Amino acid sequence: MYFRAIIFYFIFIMACTTNNESSASTEIPLRSEIDSKYKWDLTSVFESDEAWEVELDRVKNLYPNMSEFKGKLLSNPETLLSSIRLDEEVNMSLGKLWHYASNSLNADLTNEKYQEMVQRVRNVWIKYGAVTAYYTPEMLESDYSVLEGFMNENSELKQYEKVFKDAYIAKPHILSEKEEKLLTMAGKLSGVSNEAYDIMRATDFEWGSFKDENGKELTMSPGRYGKYTKSTDRRVREDMYKALYVPFKNSLNTMSVLMKGNVEGNIFYANARGYENSLEAKMKGSGISTDIYKNLIKSVNNNLQPLHRWAEIKAKTLGIEKIKPFDTYAPLADFTIEYTYEEAQKIVVDALQPLLQANEGELQKFTEKMYNENLIDVFENKGKESGAYMSSTWDLPPRIKLNYAGTLDDVFTLAHELGHAYH
């Protein structure tokens, strides 16, 4: 019952954080129907899927070499540095492989080829984790003063000081080599719930439909939530909201089990590493006390009155008795403004002029590069992952995924993701 209850919260969060649609057409367009200028180009990562295969084969032959450092990791500074350099090379390669495969898949989650490619990269990463399971336990067998001495002898190691310190802070939760290897191998199972949910939502969900302000029937999708939740017509907002939840309601039992699996996975790893609970495992790994988390929730709960007052004022302004979830983003004015993607680009540039001109126009050049070199995937298409994100990896320009629908929030999202990309 607990999981059936919290699944509603999970669904609501998913809906509220998704972005928007590419057009006002009845059906969501296929990816092939989207103009190429609005789609990211991944050929600068790998020229083709075949080139991706070549690099995957290379790293599969490379990563076993990490086993050569076992038993002599801290024999001298040069050996430690060599191990770090090899680890960086492997992770840079895997990051590049993941960047290509995962972004290709997220553009269309129904693509079975990219589903397989993502899984293959994940499998190599897990195998690499098993090969390097000895690494941290072996390092922690020595006192930290050994590493301090190494850093004094070889200045190139100094740049990894924080990595070393973090490892020693986590020492109480680092297991033996054998146990670390088992946990790494179990990692393949930990992501099954999330993967199953993503594929189910992209391929198996049968969305409801609703009629817009003009009576035109539209097929619902997560991408349409952002636009129609801001409709001035309450009937449209309510019908859209109900249509959004049709597939979730039909899959409630399945989703409850998937979420249960995700939660139990977190509990398993927390217990295995000797944390008090999964909350401590998540917080302590980032150097944050669980008290901060709990105090934040307590503080919010103790100061909800302004939010309740806002809801009362908004309900009164909208002329309704009580605000409901689909009224949360309703505009107070009786009209809405839509912005083309090109208008959004200009608005962002105009708004950021003082920043864009700093440092000899560095940010200006960066923004133009993002706009002009197919580094942004703009509109929703069938199978595309909902929401927005910025994706980056070593030695490659970042990429941004949107589901742009022309709302002011979409303009803000573009600016937000550009900020992540520049950072």
What is the meaning of each model-derived region?
Residues 1-2:
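N-terminal secretory signal peptides that target proteins for export/translocation
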Residues 5-15:
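Bacterial N-terminal signal peptides
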Residues 16, 20-334, 345:
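A well-structured
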Residues 337-339, 376-396:
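Catalytic zinc-binding patch centered on the HExxH motif and its immediate surroundings
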Residues 337-341, 395-415:
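Short pre-active-site segment immediately N-terminal to the catalytic Zn-binding motif
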Residues 340-364:
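Carboxylate/His-rich catalytic cores and anion/metal-binding grooves
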Residues 419-423:
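Catalytic Zn2+-binding segment of zinc metalloproteases
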